[in-house]
């Protein structure tokens, strides 16, 4: 790859005011000479003629020359900014490809070269794609934080503490267990406490960053005809779900994306939970339970016109079914307008009960404010964007850390501790790309836009 020069259109295909081409690689100087007639002044915008193979003008525009290593990719880079005609862009690309050893760039290849040439770490490279695909202001700001290296800083800080820990204990590795003095044992115990706190804080922040990227799954569940579909419609300001008086109308999962307090949330309407002989409806109910167990938050809708004892039984039965699940539950007491009770929120044993009318909209703003209150900790300028692979690697590192801590308590074996710390460093290093397989890189960068 390093011996090939690549070209791609940076701007979106189609007609536009401006079209930009980017070229990177060792042949870029030759491209500049053949297309521009010269190598432009480095890092200056130069008004240039773009020439074809007969030195006739194809277009006029701005050329930008970035000689290696001070460029996006760390290689020689040339950008041509011309008129955004698809025909002009195509003619320029064909002209550039006619030069030897030049090919079209693969998706994300410019960013991949930047990573491989040490211009950015893997987190920063991934955050470029996350910034482009951001759907809320908060996720865009978090992506920018990652691009600027804030996430990487915390990973490297933790890695440096691990390395420092290893250096301290490996200096004692040639001594017997009897010779390990009390002072060293105290140092190790202090280091364990320090690292434990660092891991927990970082894991909490990374989880917030993951929610910004992946979105939060909010499942709307309940018995048939409780008003689940009406709640989906009013929360999403749409008529996404069909609403009827017939029980079992909703049989499959209905998805609707909304933004709450800058966090992307996926609302999921589910089939009414009940015993039924209908085979198709039973499948829908099974899917509903599966989604409930996978969700971050359940809005469990209850028909408030039912008796108090019936409402309590419904709540108790549902909580028993998800007893071992960490999913957060809010009980939404719907049809409050029919009994003319007060609208509002009550908390019982830490669980919220909110009275609303999905038909009239009364009380729904209280529900929205409740959801916003739950998400408020995510709305923090210090949050950075995070991916599932980051969480996985951090979990692996933390699990190994807990294993190391337990093993040390039991055996006080310096060699085993040093080996565990080495494994932890490897897991953390994979997050920023210090130890990364080619398959992983291909998987990450193949999802990028062409031209990035």
UniProtKB/Swiss-Prot annotation:
Q: Where does (6S)-5-formyl-5,6,7,8-tetrahydrofolate bind?
A: 22, 79, 119, 452
Please give the biological process terms from Gene Ontology that the record holds. Answer: tRNA methylation; tRNA wobble uridine modification
| Enzyme Commission numbers on file | 3.6.-.-
Show the Gene3D superfamilies listed in the entry.
Answer: P-loop containing nucleotide triphosphate hydrolases, Probable tRNA modification gtpase trme, domain 1, tRNA modification GTPase MnmE domain 2
Per the UniProt record, the source organism is Buchnera aphidicola subsp. Acyrthosiphon pisum (strain APS)
Question: Record's InterPro entries?
Answer: G_TrmE, GTP-bd, GTP-bd_TrmE_N, GTPase_MnmE, MnmE_dom2, MnmE_helical, P-loop_NTPase, Small_GTP-bd
- Obligatory cofactor(s): K(+)
Keyword Hydrolase tagged: yes
Q: Where does GTP bind?
A: 225-230, 244-250, 269-272, 357-359
Q: What is this protein called?
A: tRNA modification GTPase MnmE
The record's principal subcellular location, in a coarse class, is cytoplasm
Q: Name one GO molecular function term.
A: GTPase activity
Lineage of this protein's species? Bacteria, Pseudomonadati, Pseudomonadota, Gammaproteobacteria, Enterobacterales
**Which PANTHER family does the record match to this protein?**
TRNA MODIFICATION GTPASE GTPBP3, TRNA MODIFICATION GTPASE GTPBP3, MITOCHONDRIAL
UniProt-listed CDD domains: trmE (cd04164), TrmE_N (cd14858)
Q: Which residues form the TrmE-type G domain?
A: 215-376
Q: Which gene encodes it?
A: mnmE
- HAMAP family with a match to the protein in the record: GTPase_MnmE
Q: Does the keyword Magnesium apply?
A: yes
According to the record, cofactor stoichiometry and binding are noted as: Binds 1 potassium ion per subunit.
Choose one Gene Ontology CC annotation of this protein and give it.
cytosol
Query: What is the top-level taxon of the source organism?
Result: Bacteria
| Quaternary data | Homodimer. Heterotetramer of two MnmE and two MnmG subunits.
The family assignment reads: Belongs to the TRAFAC class TrmE-Era-EngA-EngB-Septin-like GTPase superfamily. TrmE GTPase family.
Name the job this protein performs. Answer: Exhibits a very high intrinsic GTPase hydrolysis rate. Involved in the addition of a carboxymethylaminomethyl (cmnm) group at the wobble position (U34) of certain tRNAs, forming tRNA-cmnm(5)s(2)U34.
């Amino acid at each position: 790859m390093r011996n090939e020069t690549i070209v791609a259109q940076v701007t979106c295909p189609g007609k536009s005011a401006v079209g930009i081409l980017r070229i990177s690689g060792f042949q870029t100087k030759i491209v500049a000479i053949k297309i521009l007639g010269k190598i432009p002044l480095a890092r200056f915008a130069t008004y240039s003629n773009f020439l074809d193979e007969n030195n006739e003008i194809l277009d006029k525009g701005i050329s930008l020359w970035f000689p290696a290593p001070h460029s996006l990719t760390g290689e020689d880079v040339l950008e041509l900014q011309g008129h955004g005609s698809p025909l002009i862009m195509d003619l320029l690309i064909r002209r550039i490809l006619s030069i030897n050893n030049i090919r079209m760039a693969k998706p994300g290849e410019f960013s991949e070269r930047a990573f491989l040439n040490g211009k950015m770490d893997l987190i920063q490279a991934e955050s470029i794609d996350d910034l482009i695909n951001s759907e809320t202001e908060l996720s865009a700001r978090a992506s920018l934080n990652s691009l600027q290296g804030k996430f990487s800083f915390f990973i490297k800080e933790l890695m440096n503490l691990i390395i420092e820990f290893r250096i301290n204990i490996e200096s004692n590795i040639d001594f017997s267990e009897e010779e390990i003095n009390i002072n060293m044992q105290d140092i190790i115990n202090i280091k364990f406490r320090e690292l434990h706190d660092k891991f927990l804080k970082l894991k909490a922040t990374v989880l917030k960053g993951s929610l910004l990227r992946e979105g939060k799954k909010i499942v709307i569940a309940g018995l048939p005809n409780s008003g689940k579909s009406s709640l989906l419609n009013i929360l999403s300001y749409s008529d996404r779900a069909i609403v009827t008086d017939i029980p079992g109308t909703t049989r499959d999962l209905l998805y609707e994306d909304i933004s709450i307090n800058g966090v992307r949330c996926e609302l999921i309407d589910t089939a009414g939970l009940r015993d039924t002989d209908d085979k198709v409806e039973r499948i829908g109910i099974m899917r509903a339970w599966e989604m409930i167990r996978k969700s971050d938050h359940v809005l469990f809708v209850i028909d408030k016109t039912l008796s108090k004892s019936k409402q309590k039984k419904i709540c108790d039965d549902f909580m028993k079914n998800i007893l071992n699940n960490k999913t957060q539950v809010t009980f939404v007491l719907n049809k409050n307008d029919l009994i003319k009770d007060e609208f509002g929120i009550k908390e019982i044993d830490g669980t919220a009960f909110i009275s609303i009318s999905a038909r009239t909209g009364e009380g729904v703003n209280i529900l929205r404010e409740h959801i916003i209150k739950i998400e408020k900790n995510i709305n923090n300028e210090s949050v950075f964007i995070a991916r599932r692979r980051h969480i996985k690697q951090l979990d692996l590192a933390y699990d190994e850390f807990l294993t190391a801590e337990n093993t040390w308590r039991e055996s006080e074996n310096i060699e085993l501790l040093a080996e565990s710390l080495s494994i932890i460093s490897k897991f953390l290093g994979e997050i920023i790309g210090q130890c990364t397989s080619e398959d992983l890189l291909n998987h990450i960068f193949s999802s990028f836009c062409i031209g990035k």
